[in-house]
Regions:
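Active-site loop signature of alpha/beta-hydrolase-fold enzymes
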Residues: 8-9, 34-37, 101, 199, ...
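Conserved loop-alpha-helix segment in the C-terminal half of the alpha/beta-hydrolase fold
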Residues: 184-225, 230
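Gly/Ala-rich beta-loop-alpha elbow adjacent to hydrolase catalytic centers
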Residues: 71, 75, 79
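Conserved HGGG/HGGXW glycine-rich cap/lid loop of the alpha/beta-hydrolase fold
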Residues: 1-43
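Conserved alpha/beta-hydrolase catalytic His-Asp/Glu region
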Residues: 104-106, 122-183
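Flexible "cap/lid" loop of the alpha/beta hydrolase fold
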Residues: 80-84, 90-124
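Short beta-strand immediately N-terminal to the catalytic nucleophile in serine-hydrolase-like folds
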Residues: 69-71, 96
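Conserved acidic catalytic loop of the alpha/beta-hydrolase fold
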Residues: 49-66
C-alpha cells in the first residue's frame, strides 16, 4: 500500500507503480483532501484522521489481510502510526523521507512553517518550503509539478495537515515523541532519509532485526522520484527479504 505525502497524491508513485504492480498486490491511495479523494470539512486533517481512513479502507476492502505500507513524507508517519495502532494490518513499513525522527531544532522550523501556513497563502508557503528540500540534481519539471499541485489544493487541507505532524500534543515527527512512536513498532521498518544525523539518531529506535535506516545522498525530499531505479531496487529487495 502506497501513501503519498503532504500536498501530494498517488501520482507521486508513478515511477514505482509499474514495477510494484508486476510483483505485488498494490494499492495506491489518495488521502482525504488530496488527489481524487473527498474534501472533508475544516478540522478533519489531523494524523489520526488519515490513519482512521486507511484502517477503514483495509477493514472494508481487504478484511483480514496485511500490507507492507510504503509512505513518503506525511505518508511515512501515517504508516508508522497505523503499524503501532493496528499491527494486524501492517506487516512492514517503508518510510521514504517520512515525517519522523526530526530534531527539536527542526521542530522549531516546522512550527514557524505551521504558523506561516495559518496566516499566509498556503500555496506560497508550501512552495517556499519545497525549495529548501530539493537536491541540485532534482529535475526542474518535478519542482514545477509539486508547486503547481500545492497551489491548486484547498487551503484548509494544506494548512491543517502540516502542523499536527510536528507541533503540539500528539505530534510524532520531532524529538522524544517521534522516538517513542518508532520504538513502539514491532514490525520491520525500512527508513530512507537524506540527513546523516537523522539516520544515526534513528537507527537504535527500531527493534525488529530486519529493520534498517539508510541515508540517501544525491536526492531531494522526493527520493523515489530523484533516484527512481535505485529506490525501486532497494525497496523491492528489502520487501522480498522480509
Amino acid at each position: 500500500m502506497l501513501l503519498h505525502g503532504w500536498t501530494g497524491d498517488s501520482h507521486d508513485w508513478s515511477w514505482q507503480l509499474p514495477l510494484f504492480e508486476s510483483r505485488y498486490r498494490t494499492v495506491a491511495v489518495d488521502l482525504r483532501g488530496h488527489g481524487r479523494s473527498e474534501i472533508m470539512p475544516p478540522g478533519c486533517y489531523r494524523p489520526d484522521d488519515y490513519v482512521a481512513d486507511i484502517e477503514a479502507l483495509i477493514a472494508t476492502e481487504y478484511p483480514g489481510q496485511e500490507f507492507v505500507v510504503v509512505g513518503h513524507s506525511m505518508g511515512g508517519q501515517i504508516a508508522a502510526r497505523l503499524a503501532a495502532r493496528r499491527p494486524d494490518m501492517v506487516s512492514a513499513v517503508v518510510s521514504i523521507d517520512g515525517a519522523l525522527g526530526f530534531s527539536d531544532e527542526m521542530g522549531e522550523r516546522f512550527a514557524k512553517t505551521a504558523h506561516d501556513l495559518a496566516v499566509g497563502d498556503p500555496g506560497v508557503v508550501a512552495s517556499a518550503l519545497f525549495q529548501q528540500v530539493y537536491d541540485p540534481s532534482t529535475d526542474p519539471a518535478f519542482k514545477l509539478w509539486h508547486r503547481r499541485r500545492a497551489q491548486g489544493m484547498p487551503a484548509d487541507v494544506v494548512r491543517e495537515s502540516f502542523g499536527p505532524l510536528f507541533v503540539g500534543d500528539g505530534q510524532a515527527g520531532v524529538g522524544a515523541a517521534s522516538a517513542s512512536l518508532c520504538r513502539s513498532l514491532k514490525v520491520p521498518v525500512y527508513h530512507l532519509c537524506r540527513d546523516p544525523a537523522q539516520a544515526d539518531r534513528m537507527r537504535p529506535w527500531f527493534s525488529h532485526p530486519k529493520s534498517k535506516v539508510d541515508r540517501w545522498p544525491h536526492a531531494g525530499h522526493w527520493i523515489m522520484q530523484d533516484r527512481q531505479e535505485d529506490v525501486n531496487a532497494a525497496v523491492t529487495a528489502w520487501i522480498d527479504a522480509v
